[in-house]
Amino acid sequence: MTMTGADARVILVANQKGGVGKSTTVAAVAEMIAAAGKRGRRVLVVDGDPQANVTVEDLGVQGDRGQSLAQTLQFNAPLVPVRNVRANLDVIAGGPQLAVVGAGAHLMVDNGIDMAANLEHQLGVLSAAEGYDLVLIDSGPGDVPLLDTYLAVANYLLIPTRDDQASLGGVERLARRFWRARQLGASIQLLGVLLFDVNPRATKRNQDVFDQVAEMLEGSGTTPFDITIRSAPAAAVDMRTLHKTAGELVALADDDRRARLSKLRHHQSPERAMWTSDPTGLAADYQELVRQIVARLARYESARYGERVG
């Protein structure tokens, strides 16, 4: 099965706790898949969060404050993407208009409006027209009606989490929404849980968290991702300040290093444009995550369709 057109996979990235790396993960994975190889893949990011972090902070896009997505959810209006924010990468912007939708969700249900059906229909139309291979939905932590809508639409769920109990509590709450969506007929599958912002040398602590997560996921047919995303505070500041992903920081760090060396050779005071000096390890973490995501998609879809993912 090839990753094209109406066959675009829809991956929801969610956790019912904020600050666990959802938006950062969406941006990093989307950019790497879109840029991979000579042609890359066509990727659409749907920022389903009223805070719009992946739109504004991670990708540096000035969107429509969530207006297009809100109109789709409420009125089945066509989705209007911000095109070519990176090569092969489009964005449906998030923003505060989505908070209005979430607050009025019960009224829409009373009036027979099916937000999930509207979004699923318009995503299918847009994916077929634009030839998207992958759709990544970034979900906010607190708006349950919106979260339930995305769970009903997505094919797969990826859950980033930190190793603290509050974040793991968010995983547990989301797991309950996931199972509820499945009971209501959603076809969504759990792709895996990603441990984010951790010390890779804290192997005992990380294994303890893996064990807790595995217990939460029992019966889901999947396990946590083997890769963890390392803690990199300086790179995190640079990514949000410069609106770049971990992969994009690597080239910028090289340019920054060369510029500072050139100024030193000319006896000038170098100005540091970035806080991080070497983001290659962080970028490698995300590259391995992308590899594992593609491998899991291939395994799931081979079992479902008897074919390999192309």
Language-model regions, residue ranges each:
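P-loop NTP-binding core
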Residues: 1-310
